[in-house]
Amino acid sequence: LMVKILLMKHGTLNEYLIGKVTELDEEPSILVEGCYKIVDGKLETYPKYSSQRDLFLTSDAVFTIVDPSTEILGEYQKVNE
């Protein structure tokens, strides 16, 4: 599975999630495994108040999906060792 960054649509397009992304044929069409939120270059648990790290998202909630930078990928790999 490829680690990707998801830029979420709601708000001011400044909410970034990172995880292993699988695109599915039906809604909810995006599975994010090992999901974290990126805040100021650091990873925070997401969603808060839950130990669940795997999420299903609908395609209309996501603005775009991009590859992570080397630095943030390194941070992600550290928390998922």
Feature map (PLM): residue ranges:
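Conserved RNA-binding domains used in RNP assembly and mRNA/RNA metabolism
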Residues: 1-81
